[in-house]
Amino acid sequence: VFALNANKEVFVTEDFSRGTIKINKTAEDGIVADREFKVTGSDGSSYTKKTNAAGVAEFSGLKVYDVDAKTAITYTISEINVETRYETPKAQNVTLTSGTVDLTVTANFVNELKTGSIRINKQSEDNQNGDRTFTITGNGETYTITTGADGIAILSDIPVYNSENEKIEYTISEKDVPIRYVVPANQTATLTADATVD
C-alpha cells in the first residue's frame, strides 16, 4: 500500500514474463549427446545450444512477448549441423504461451537414419529362381532374404551410413546353392538414401 502525496511521481518497473524451451532428442541409433539446436525468435533473437548426455537441451530465460509488436514471440527450433547419416528433422514453431503454467514448452526431435534398399534379381539357365536364399551383411549386421517365384527378393530400410558417417559396404551371398549350379561369387554394394540398388 502506497501513501501518495499530491504531485508525487511514482516509478513502476515491469518484469516481463520469461519462459523455457526444453528439447528432448532421440535417435534410431541411440546417439543423442552433443546434437546442436538453434532457437530463433520472431523478435530477432537467436540462441544455440547442444544436448547433454541424455539428449536434453534447455533454453531458459526466453522472452514470452514482443512488447513492440504487442504479441507473443514465435520461436523456431531447428536442429543444425545434422550428421550425414541422419535425415534432417523438420523445424518446429512454438510460442511459450502454449506451454505449461511455468511457461515451459517441450519439443521432441527424432534422428531417423537414412535408409535404402537392395533388390536381388536371381537368374539361372533352367529358370528355377524361386525360393533361393541370400544373406546380406554389413556394419556388423546380417540379413537373410528369400526370392519369390519370379526370382526377386528385396531388403528394404537398411542403413546407408555407419556411426562414423561412412557409407556401409554390404556383401551379398547366395546360400544353400543346389549342387547342380556353380556357386556365384559374392557381390558388394553401397546404398543411396531412399533408393533401391539392384
Model-derived regions: residue spans:
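Solvent-exposed loop/turn and edge beta-strand elements of beta-rich ligand-binding domains
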Residues: 1-198
